[in-house]
């Protein structure tokens, strides 16, 4: 027979021996026939002395072969029965087992939940630390989204050389239409030659003459030369003609000054003006004669010119163009100094 006993509170073999003294070991001799289950003899002793008996001088094999006499009952006839047996005891260290299976499962679940929550907290702290380390090495988001690709950067390199600090990323907004007014005393051809030399690698984009004329005429009169700029690289020059003279003595001085400006202007902007607009009807020989100082020859030629204009297919466009220029001349002119100051900001 084998008996196993677990002591939960014991730490060493000495504590186990002390605990064995509190337990009792008992052998009983019971009668099976009638009267049944009557006790005939018994043997009892504490478990420590039963398992670990004191040594005896007579016994040759200590613990291997043992003999004990049982105590008989009062009514039992005869001698006391004797028991021969051998015992072997071993004290082993073991892990404390759970009494209830459900309690063990609950403890395991609690341990797993605690370990998972601790792991999630560690991962969250690591994630919070990583973006801070990355942000110190990387650029802000706004600049990353605005950084151009290598092809765009290569295309914008000539503008960076020409304009210097005025280079902007393609994501930024460009300034609106810019109108610059130039004084008639300042030669306009010099600035135009410099810009043409810088922008010779790029072809200027052409726009319609009528649209550019309406935008320019709404800001200033046609007495000054007007320059409309779509972009820093796209510039188209519009040339204005002097208004029809009212007096022969007053119209000679401005006509000479405007002719001088026009001669310089045509030399520098031949490439853009010839491609961007059709020939002006004011350059027609008949209209030039009408705007010249009055004389007897002109008075004689006026009826013939009127007849030719009425019979030609261009009569209506010329009349509309002359009425439009007259309405523009009647508008008040703005001072040129303010526009010059605004123009210097973009150049």
UniProtKB/Swiss-Prot annotation:
InterPro entries linked: SPATA6_fam, SPATA6_N
Region (Disordered): 115-199, 234-285
Feature: compositional bias, Basic and acidic residues: 170-183
UniProt-recorded Gene Ontology molecular function terms: myosin light chain binding
Signal peptide limits: none
Ranges of Polar residues composition bias in the record: 116-125, 254-277
Record's keyword annotation contains Cell division: no
Compositional bias (Basic residues): 153-166
Phosphoserine modifications at: 218, 221
Disulphide linkage map: none
Biological processes annotated in GO: spermatogenesis
Pfam families cross-referenced by the UniProt entry: SPATA6 (PF14909)
Entry keyword set: Phosphoprotein
One cellular component (GO) term of this entry: sperm head-tail coupling apparatus
Family statement: Belongs to the SPATA6 family.
Protein name as annotated: Spermatogenesis associated 6-like protein
Upper taxonomic lineage: Eukaryota, Metazoa, Chordata, Craniata, Vertebrata
């Amino acid at each position: 027979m084998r008996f196993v006993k677990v002591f939960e509170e014991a730490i060493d073999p000495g504590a186990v021996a002390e605990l064995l003294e509190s337990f009792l070991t008992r052998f009983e001799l019971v009668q099976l026939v009638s009267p049944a289950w009557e006790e005939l003899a018994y043997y009892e002793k504490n478990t420590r002395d039963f398992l670990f008996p004191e040594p005896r001088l007579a016994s040759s094999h200590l613990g291997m072969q043992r003999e004990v006499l049982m105590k008989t009952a009062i009514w039992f006839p005869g001698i006391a029965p004797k028991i021969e047996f051998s015992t072997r005891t071993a004290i082993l260290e073991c892990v404390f087992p759970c009494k209830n299976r459900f309690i063990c499962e609950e403890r395991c679940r609690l341990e797993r939940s605690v370990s998972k929550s601790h792991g999630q907290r560690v991962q969250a702290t690591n994630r919070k630390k990583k973006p801070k380390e990355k942000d110190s090495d990387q650029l802000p988001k706004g600049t990353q989204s605005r950084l151009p690709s290598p092809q765009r950067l290569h295309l914008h390199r000539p503008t960076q050389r020409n304009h210097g600090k005025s280079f902007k990323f393609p994501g930024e907004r460009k300034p609106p239409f810019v109108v610059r007014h130039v004084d008639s005393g300042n030669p306009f051809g010099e600035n135009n030659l410099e810009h043409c030399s810088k922008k010779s690698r790029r072809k200027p984009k052409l726009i319609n003459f009528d649209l550019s004329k309406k935008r320019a005429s709404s800001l200033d009169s046609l007495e000054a030369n007007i320059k409309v700029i779509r972009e820093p690289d796209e510039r188209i020059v519009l040339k204005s003609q002097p208004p029809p003279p009212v007096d022969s003595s007053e119209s000679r001085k401005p006509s000479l000054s405007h002719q001088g400006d026009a001669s310089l202007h045509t030399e520098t902007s031949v490439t853009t003006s010839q491609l961007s607009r059709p020939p002006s009807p004011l350059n027609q020989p008949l209209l030039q004669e009408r705007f010249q100082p009055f004389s007897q020859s002109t008075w004689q030629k006026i009826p013939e010119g009127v007849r030719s204009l009425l019979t030609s297919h261009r009569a209506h466009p010329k009349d509309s163009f002359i009425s439009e220029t007259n309405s523009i001349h009647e508008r008040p002119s703005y001072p040129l100094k303010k526009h010059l100051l605004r123009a210097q900001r973009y150049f």
